[in-house]
Amino acid sequence: MGLVKGNCGCYWGIKGHWSRNCSPVCEIANKNYYSRRGIAPRRTFWSVSNKSLVHLDANSLMIDYENVFYYTTDITSNKAIIESSERIRQDHGNPSVLINNAGVANGKTILEESEDERRRVFNVDILAHFSLVREFLPDMIKHNHGHIVTVASTASFLARPQLVSYSCCKTALIAFHEGLSQELRMRHNARKVRTT
């Protein structure tokens, strides 16, 4: 979270979004991690206000920590995202910070990669971001408070062999971020919902 806090101030200044009443400290944040095998993306919500940490992961995790909660969720499924989002809102409230950092890659050439493998990359690396934003952005707009962080990759600018589908998704994330930023400002008049 320290990296996010450091980058937020820099970005807000560049975009002219300085605000004294909005701290970049995350009240409830969504982050993404990977399982040990690197194939199961995990989403994590962190709450400063009630000190809860909520993980969404395709695998069932059984690590017992105080104030840490796990939700088994297949983020390639929009239905599963909606169901988990509803449970999170019931149990922890709406997140005010969403950090989209999910990413998987197959490491195969275009000809080697199966259609199912390619669709999985797109479902995790870009489409899950749309689904999560649709779930949590309305409350941020309503309160004109929140932050959505979209993490792309250098692969957005340099497509490498055996990472073409991954690079396509990461490039799409840049357009996603830029379009979302403009919609918040020009269509929703939610200038205090930040994007990084």
UniProtKB/Swiss-Prot annotation:
Known catalysed reaction(s)? a primary alcohol + NAD(+) = an aldehyde + NADH + H(+); a secondary alcohol + NAD(+) = a ketone + NADH + H(+)
Asked whether the UniProt record includes Lipid metabolism among its keywords, one would answer no
Pathway listed for it? Mycotoxin biosynthesis
- Give the first-level EC class, as a single word: oxidoreductase
Deletion consequences:
Significantly reduces the production of T-toxin and decreases the virulence to maize.
Q: Where does NADP(+) bind?
A: 47, 74, 101, 134, 166, 170
Enzyme Commission number: 1.1.1.1
**A Gene Ontology MF term for this entry?**
alcohol dehydrogenase (NAD+) activity
What the record says about family reads: Belongs to the short-chain dehydrogenases/reductases (SDR) family.
- Protein name (database record): Dehydrogenase RED3
Organism, per UniProt?
Cochliobolus heterostrophus (strain C4 / ATCC 48331 / race T)
| Gene that specifies this protein | RED3
